[in-house]
Amino acid sequence: RLCIPVIFPC
C-alpha cells in the first residue's frame, strides 16, 4: 500500500 506520512505515520 501507499504510505503517506502527511496523512498518517508509517
From Swiss-Prot:
What's the main place this protein lives? secreted
**Which positions are tagged coiled coil?**
none
Q: Which GO CC annotations does the UniProt entry carry? A: extracellular region
**Which tissues does it occur in?**
Expressed by the skin glands.
Name the UniProt key words of this record, in alphabetical order.
Answer: Amphibian defense peptide, Disulfide bond, Secreted
The entry's localization annotation reads: Secreted
Q: What is the residue range of the signal peptide feature?
A: none
| Gene Ontology biological process terms, A to Z | defense response; positive regulation of leukocyte proliferation
Disulphide-bridged cysteine pairs: C3-C10
The job of this chain, per UniProt, is described as: Induces mouse splenocyte proliferation through binding to CCK-BR.
Q: What is this protein called?
A: Riparin-1.1
